[in-house]
Amino acid sequence: MRYTGLMGILLTLVNLLQLAATLRIAAFNIRTFGDTKMSNATLSSYIVKILSRYDIAVVQEVRDTHLVAVGKLLDELNRDIPDNYRYIISEPLGRKSYKEQYLFVYRPSQVSVLDSYHYDDGCEPCGNDTFSREPAIVKFFSPYTEVREFAIVPLHSAPTEAVSEIDALYDVYLDVRQKWGLEDIMFMGDFNAGCSYVTSSQWSSIRLRTSPIFQWLIPDSADTTATSTHCAYDRIVVAGALLQAAVVPSSAVPFDFQAEYRLTNQMAEAISDHYPVEVTLRKT
């Protein structure tokens, strides 16, 4: 009995050491994330539980202009450990009255924000902008990983414009390189990069896919949806030799929170119709 208990403690310590030796990053489209969802104790508890898995999490489909829901989220994330998480959020983005924000939550004990900017994709009133929700780009410094500085570029594409928007991320890549002199860049989020929105014949027209600069970590065969569909909408794409080398092999996966927490279909879809997509970076 003592031996069994000791082995359990040792296994727990090994797991903790493994977690401490890595940096876990995710993108999560939380459907219509706002005060209504964060005011529901059950839903908010699962959202906090999911996001607590990550050192950096990019939350998409945030609809919280006055940051009421974001405030509640940070209160819960920091309930047990003060200043465990901080955040940076974009302005409301969208061509018409419907707007969304990109929210980054991160552990300041693991990474720090060096800089951020909104990609200039053209004139919205003129109708010649590229993205429905242009990327809000954040540069991080990570003192403990093999790659010290890297940028995260989020995208929640408009489904009917997924092909052109994913292709245009190549231009965002060039812009980030020119602005910051940085090659280690991670693109992530709900690209709507699958099923009827991006068909097999359309991949050849997407520079982010055809260029050897980029590694696509979530395969076309993946299912990133919490619904009855089987689509690889959510993706992670990495550029830069240091960042690519820092990726732990086979760590880029959708996180099936329904299976992990044994949720009903109804409860899972109430949280979101998407799973987070996650990846782990090695620490030195």
Swiss-Prot record:
It catalyses: Endonucleolytic cleavage to 5'-phosphodinucleotide and 5'-phosphooligonucleotide end-products. One of its GO terms (molecular function) is actin binding. It is found in: Secreted; Zymogen granule; Nucleus envelope. InterPro entries: Deoxyribonuclease-1_AS (IPR018057), DNase_I (IPR016202), DNASE_I_2 (IPR033125), Endo/exonu/phosph_ase_sf (IPR036691), Endo/exonuclease/phosphatase (IPR005135). It comes from the Eukaryota. Pfam families: Exo_endo_phos. Divalent metal cations. Prefers Ca(2+) or Mg(2+). GO terms for biological process: apoptotic process; DNA catabolic process; neutrophil activation involved in immune response; regulation of acute inflammatory response; regulation of neutrophil mediated cytotoxicity. The record marks 87 as: Nitration by tetranitromethane destroys a Ca(2+) binding site and inactivates enzyme. Its EC number is 3.1.21.1. Keywords: Actin-binding, Apoptosis, Calcium, Cytoplasmic vesicle, Disulfide bond, Endonuclease, Glycoprotein, Hydrolase, Nuclease, Nucleus, Secreted, Signal. Disulfide bonds join 123-126, 195-231. The active site is at residues 100, 156. Glycans are attached at residues 40, 128. Belongs to the DNase I family. This is Deoxyribonuclease-1. It comes from Rattus norvegicus (Rat).
